[in-house]
UniProtKB/Swiss-Prot annotation:
BP terms from Gene Ontology: lactate metabolic process
Superkingdom of source: Bacteria
Functional summary from the UniProt entry: Is involved in L-lactate degradation and allows cells to grow with lactate as the sole carbon source.
Coiled coil: none
Record family assignment: Belongs to the LutA/YkgE family.
Species per Swiss-Prot/TrEMBL record: Halalkalibacterium halodurans (strain ATCC BAA-125 / DSM 18197 / FERM 7344 / JCM 9153 / C-125) (Bacillus halodurans)
Encoding gene, per UniProt annotation: lutA
Pfam families on file: CCG (PF02754)
Protein name: Lactate utilization protein A
GO MF entries: oxidoreductase activity
């Protein structure tokens, strides 16, 4: 099975190890992974800021980039959710709208792909930690994915997963929201950090780098000893340990 990796901006620039873990996971389950180098941002920051004309150009570029892919997989529910906006964005151009629909049909967030396409039953990973999981807004509300990450995490050996209070609430990142509405964003992330602390977790797991960056930054400034881990890193943890 051939898979094209959609790495996303944040993983590419700030969290390259997330890309490595994603590739290693996919290869472990028999996938042949390719990385189309011409890929760019999905266009979400421009789209959320109202620059829809510019976003259309990005959307068409990404549609072209992954046109020949069998499957497209990304370690970000938020960016995959943005692909779902392309169809509406290009509604006045039927040919491009149809191409956008085809892209969406073959694009998956990592945990979705592992559970729903590869039908993974065992993850063969271990993490001796008390952790909690942050459900990102875009992945939950726009992509509609709520269960796959938990299906995988419950199979990680040694992982004690605690329920995060009010897990459905936003962490305050929201892409450009955290820049445009900084005071509100800060209050939201402070509330999220309080809920994380209530669980007594040593590790916060998430499937979107933006959320992890926002929450992790706040936790670091508060001097709290809570580690941020992307879902891909957790699922690949034992493999990395063996290599080291």
């Amino acid at each position: 099975m051939k898979v094209s990796l959609f790495i996303t901006c944040l993983a590419d620039v700030f969290y390259p190890d997330v890309g490595r873990h994603t590739v290693e996971l996919l290869e472990r389950y028999g996938c042949e992974v390719e990385f189309p180098e011409q890929q760019t941002c999905c266009g979400q920051p421009a789209y959320n800021s109202g620059y829809h004309r510019d976003t259309k150009k990005v959307a068409k570029h990404m549609i072209e980039t992954f046109a020949r892919a069998e499957y497209v997989v990304s370690p970000s529910g938020s960016c995959v959710a943005m692909f779902h906006e392309y169809e509406e964005l290009l509604k006045d151009e039927p040919v491009w709208q149809e191409r956008a629909k085809k892209l969406v049909a073959k694009t998956y967030e990592l945990s979705q792909f592992l559970v729903n396409v590869l039908k993974v039953k065992e993850v063969h990973s271990s993490l001796q930690a008390k952790a909690t999981y942050h459900t990102s807004c875009h992945m939950t509300r726009l992509l509609g994915e709520t269960q796959s990450p938990f299906d995988l995490l419950e199979k990680v050996e040694g992982l004690q997963l605690e329920e995060l209070p009010n897990r459905e609430t936003c962490c305050g990142f929201g892409g450009t929201f955290s820049v445009k509405m900084t005071p509100i964003s800060e209050q939201m992330v402070d509330e999220k950090v309080r809920h994380i602390e209530e669980t007594g977790a040593d590790v916060l797991i998430g499937a979107d780098c933006g959320c992890l960056m926002n929450i992790g930054g706040r936790i670091q400034r508060k001097g709290k000893p809570i580690k941020m881990m992307h879902l891909a890193e957790v699922l690949n943890h034992q493999e990395r340990t063996r290599e080291e």
